[in-house]
Amino acid sequence: MRHRKSGRHLSRTSAHRKAMFQNMAVSLFEHELIKTTLPKAKELRRVAEPLITLAKEDSVANRRLAFDRTRSKAIVGKLFNDLGKRYATRNGGYLRILKCGFRAGDNAPMAYVELVDRPVGGSVEAAE
């Protein structure tokens, strides 16, 4: 029975899923806009938003938790120094998912995942 089991498998092992979402979260925090498939985008929200919530309170313990989940010192620095302060007054909803059509090869639904209130200087072409 699958009672209370949430989340998508995405045809991957649990280790592959964990590594994939860790890499996607790091890319999202680095570029603030990424393009991926719609199911991956919806699952990424469950990984990335708690990290931003964690970054709103700067402590050594929270930094260690964030490093454990991202494995990137640069991203931990950006989370706590930039993103945590940017979203200090926002109670959740840090990501925006925008549908952007279908992929040419396999017709998979695609989506942009971006951080809300990000600087406007970034371009959509950089996400591709």
UniProtKB/Swiss-Prot annotation:
User: Annotated Gene Ontology MF terms?
Assistant: structural constituent of ribosome
Q: Which domain of life is it from?
A: Bacteria
User: Ribosomal protein: present as a keyword of the record?
Assistant: yes
Keywords from UniProt, A to Z, are: Ribonucleoprotein, Ribosomal protein
Report quaternary structure and partners.
Answer: Part of the 50S ribosomal subunit. Contacts protein L32.
Matching entries from Gene3D superfamilies are given as: Ribosomal protein L17
The record's Pfam families line, in alphabetical order, gives: Ribosomal_L17 (PF01196)
GO CC annotations, alphabetized: cytosolic large ribosomal subunit
Biological process, per Gene Ontology: translation
The family assignment reads: Belongs to the bacterial ribosomal protein bL17 family.
- Source organism: Ectopseudomonas mendocina (strain ymp) (Pseudomonas mendocina)
On whether Ribonucleoprotein is a keyword of this UniProt record, the answer is yes
PANTHER family from the entry?
A: LARGE RIBOSOMAL SUBUNIT PROTEIN BL17M, RIBOSOMAL PROTEIN L17
Under which name does UniProt file this protein? Large ribosomal subunit protein bL17
